[in-house]
């Protein structure tokens, strides 16, 4: 029987395109992969694969710079960021660039600089990618052994892993240095409704606090790491993570894999791809929850309110209105017999009544000043509500992070809601969807890598398929 596949490929793929189509000298006959398989043709060409990765980085950075400048060009300072469909400027504002008290944007020049720097960087990466893809050596092992590798070389692979971990650790410390030494970061919890820049002076480095987040429940008021609500803990956590990544990187560079790791793991290019996709899927799912629920790392001034925040803001807004109209908010009953404005949680805490009771564990900068030791404080609700709290809750009430692809956002029953989709909705949904696809990719490539390692990568022998021994359907 004529062999349908190259000995170098893992399993046969029949394609409408025959092997005569050559792309840059890397055709199906020599690599076992058709042109549309992309970088799979470069599995054993480390120099060309480097070019593909550098060019890919250039495309990513180009998008970041171009989209950054596009958002700057369309930005209207008088409107909140979350009403303008912005997904990049909120990140820059969170780092404290260009913002004043209350999250008001007072200078867009830093955003312009960011976009231009990314465009310049993308040009450098683009030239590097083109050079290595077209002109540079096909393989690096002979000319530049430090940068060369063989996929099955376990020691080299863990060295590369170590270098990546060190780079990630340096990235974590960049945020730490920004918060400590280079102007600080935006603090949504500053008194009076947010502060433009606050240098962090009292880092949380206690391991019991930092790692305590990991031991919290995922559910209810616990909220795992997503429940972090002060900058000291966030920046302190980056000190810990950066240190762990850097020391872990040094460890992986200096050591060789233990025997159990050599036995347990599959050591091939496709296996490393599957591990990476699995890790990215986990990151995507965590980021989805973080963006959706956390209003400290993702301040509501820039990203719009969280879902629970918009709901509690609605309850607060109508409490303020009806209290002014003479309602006794402490004792008024709702249609179910529970408190209309205020009620007690099962643990005795005073919380907002009505449907928003499910979001009793919300913490938000505009609401916390009205809490006492047992939840919401009735005397503070009667005497201490400030105009900025009323304005902010009314704004957040009409900007719930709900919406669909046709941009009908806001709560459908609220006549003053705005037609928009919140950046929170975009960012959390996109990270969930991409995380899911990456997880599927992880399963796919893990299955292929394990099959190749086990030696049955060519699929089931068609002569012995179970279906052949079964009776016909009719």
Curated annotation (Swiss-Prot):
Membrane topology: Multi-pass membrane protein
Record's cofactor remark: Binds multiple chlorophylls and provides some of the ligands for the Ca-4Mn-5O cluster of the oxygen-evolving complex. It may also provide a ligand for a Cl- that is required for oxygen evolution. PSII binds additional chlorophylls, carotenoids and specific lipids.
Assigned keywords, A-Z: Acetylation, Chlorophyll, Chloroplast, Chromophore, Manganese, Membrane, Metal-binding, Phosphoprotein, Photosynthesis, Photosystem II, Plastid, Thylakoid, Transmembrane, Transmembrane helix
Modified residues annotated as N-acetylthreonine in this record: 15
InterPro entries membership: PS_antenna-like, PS_II_antenna-like_sf, PSII_PsbC, PSII_PsbC_sf
GO cellular component, one term: photosystem II
Coiled coil (residue ranges): none
Annotated [CaMn4O5] cluster binding sites: 368
Residues making up the propeptide: 1-14
Gene Ontology MF: a single term: metal ion binding
Cell compartment(s), UniProt: Plastid, Chloroplast thylakoid membrane
Modification type Phosphothreonine: residues: 15
Family listed: Belongs to the PsbB/PsbC family. PsbC subfamily.
Biological role stated in the UniProt entry: One of the components of the core complex of photosystem II (PSII). It binds chlorophyll and helps catalyze the primary light-induced photochemical processes of PSII. PSII is a light-driven water:plastoquinone oxidoreductase, using light energy to abstract electrons from H(2)O, generating O(2) and a proton gradient subsequently used for ATP formation.
Record-linked NCBIfam families: psbC
Subunit and interaction comment: PSII is composed of 1 copy each of membrane proteins PsbA, PsbB, PsbC, PsbD, PsbE, PsbF, PsbH, PsbI, PsbJ, PsbK, PsbL, PsbM, PsbT, PsbX, PsbY, PsbZ, Psb30/Ycf12, at least 3 peripheral proteins of the oxygen-evolving complex and a large number of cofactors. It forms dimeric complexes.
Name of this chain's protein: Photosystem II CP43 reaction center protein
Taxon lineage: Eukaryota, Viridiplantae, Streptophyta, Embryophyta, Tracheophyta
Gene from which this protein is expressed: psbC
